[in-house]
Amino acid sequence: MYRLRELKVEVFLVHPGGPFWAKKDLGAWSIPKGEYASGEDPLDAARREFAEETGFETGEDFIPLGTIKQAGGKLVSVWVVEGDCDPAQIRSNLCTIEWPPRSGIKIEIPEVDRAAWFKLDEARERILKSQAPMLDLLLAHLKEVAT
């Protein structure tokens, strides 16, 4: 999700929940996203994941930005929607993890523990390195529609 504020582009990012991510900030934030099941429409999955991780519904006007290949070889389909929401109001789904690792102890954590709007420069510092190309796709799209 993106919005324009004072003629600047801002992107909505989420911070993963749980003890592993608790003290990590720069390079730890993410675009709300997730896996889709076999047979599930990727755009439907994107909408579902956004709602699960934030508690917010998105608009209908999603724009396909393309596909990026992450370091591990995974192909990620990227869409964007213009919108607005209050990060203080997020309500994330919960997930179960083993913590500490290999301990056999299961704990329930929020998939996302906070969210925020960031201008593109700051978003580049905060976002997971593997997701930075998604910001490039957004910027290229916005430049294209502005001309």
Where are the language model's segments positioned?
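Residues that scaffold the ATP/ADP-binding catalytic core of kinase and kinase-like folds
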Residues: 23, 39, 126
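Short, charged/polar surface micro-motifs in flexible loops or helix N-caps
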Residues: 6-7, 18-21, 37-38, 56, ...
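N-terminal strand-loop-strand
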Residues: 1-31, 79
